[in-house]
Amino acid sequence: GFADLFGKVANLIKS
């Protein structure tokens, strides 16, 4: 879902 996608992107940016 969108939440999963957003979380994945956020994690990528955070890294």
Curated annotation (Swiss-Prot):
Tissue expr: Expressed by the skin glands.
Cellular-component GO terms for this entry: extracellular region
Main location: secreted
GO biological process: defense response; negative regulation of nitric-oxide synthase activity
Residue list for modification Serine amide: S15
Function: Inhibits the formation of NO by neuronal nitric oxide synthase.
Entry protein name: Signiferin-4.1
